Swiss-Prot record:
This is Acetylglutamate kinase. It is found in: Cytoplasm. Transmembrane segments: none annotated. One of its GO terms (biological process) is L-arginine biosynthetic process. It comes from the Bacteria. GO terms for cellular component: cytoplasm. Keywords: Amino-acid biosynthesis, Arginine biosynthesis, ATP-binding, Cytoplasm, Kinase, Nucleotide-binding, Transferase. One of its GO terms (molecular function) is acetylglutamate kinase activity. It comes from Geobacter metallireducens (strain ATCC 53774 / DSM 7210 / GS-15). Belongs to the acetylglutamate kinase family. ArgB subfamily. Substrate binds at G64, G65, R86, N190. Its main location: cytoplasm. It catalyses: N-acetyl-L-glutamate + ATP = N-acetyl-L-glutamyl 5-phosphate + ADP. NCBIfam families: argB (TIGR00761). The lineage of its organism: Bacteria, Pseudomonadati, Thermodesulfobacteriota, Desulfuromonadia, Geobacterales.
């Protein structure tokens, strides 16, 4: 009997969050280990489908770095990275677009639909969903100055066609977006999936942005998880060496999204089963929440 009571208590804990998020939009960046482990893939699919069944508009933006690396290797194309960004020439861009839109996107959509969802795959080129311009990466020179470097067909999102996403949401569909953008002349751009998720969340004025990662969240210098960060503390935490390395662009993405109108953003551990539900429907969550 006790375990039944505990289940009831869990449902009651979720109730205020269900009320809060019903009719609102949540944007989830799906990537990392959660995309390769079968149990985690199923867990993620069921989480997203449950959110949609509760009246929560859920938008998925996926990555695909490992799949791109594998295919480039098969084609004998060697990748170069500048500050974590893949240098993307025309040949590399062809592979990136093929893998993200023709392979990974279809796999994610298929998995959601297989488990009872109504997912629709999109790339940023569909309906000019993600209008982009070339992103010039800043690189520190020997004298300490910053120089902007052209790294090929790598894009920054300048406009999101939110009407396309909202049309799908109103039709009870789950939009699944591949991070390939389009330029003014129709050229394709490789766009960081975290950046896409943040821009989409900002355009939709989402209630929450969630980034799935392969770490617990933001940790302090003692290695302990920081459950919450307010916006004003972010510069201090970066300058103080608490937020470092690859976590800096993720946190910056969350900050930018909040500045664009997103209520809250979370960086969570995608290696945890049902991490999305635990983050949204429990009092403590499973990662680091960033808020005003």
């Amino acid at each position: 009997m006790q375990h039944l009571i505990e289940k009831a208590n869990t449902l009651m804990e979720a109730l205020p969050y269900i009320r809060r998020f019903s009719g609102k939009t949540i944007v989830i960046k799906y990537g990392g280990h959660a995309m390769s482990d079968e149990a985690l893939k199923k867990s993620f699919a069921l989480d997203v489908i449950l959110l949609k069944s509760l009246g929560i508009n859920t938008v998925v933006v996926h990555g695909g770095g490992p799949q791109i690396n594998e295919t480039l290797k098969r084609y004998g194309i060697v990748s170069e990275f500048v500050r974590g960004m893949r240098v993307t020439d025309a040949a590399t861009m062809q592979v990136v677009e093929m893998v993200l839109t023709g392979q990974v996107n279809k796999e994610v959509v298929g998995y959601l639909n297989q488990h009872g969802g109504r997912a629709v795959g999109l790339s940023g080129k569909d309906g000019s969903l993600l209008l982009c311009r070339k992103l010039l990466q800043e690189v520190k020179q020997g004298d300490g100055s910053l120089e902007k470097v052209d790294i090929g067909f790598v894009g920054d999102v300048v406009k999101v066609n939110q009407e396309l996403i909202q049309t799908l949401e109103h039709g009870k569909f789950i939009p699944v977006i591949a991070p390939v953008g389009v330029g003014e002349d129709g050229e394709s751009y490789n766009v960081n999936a975290d950046l896409v998720a943040g821009r989409v969340a900002g355009a939709l004025k989402a209630e929450k942005l969630i980034l799935l990662t392969d770490v617990e969240g933001v940790k302090d210098k003692a290695g302990e998880l920081i459950p919450g960060i307010v916006l004003d503390d972010v510069p201090r935490l970066i300058d103080g060496g608490v937020i470092t390395g690859g976590m800096i662009p993720k946190v910056t993405c969350c900050v930018d999204a909040i500045e664009e109108g997103v209520k809250k953003a979370s960086i969570i551990d995608g290696r945890v089963l049902h991490a999305v539900l635990l983050e949204i429907f429990t009092d403590v969550g499973v990662g680091t929440e960033i808020r005003r």
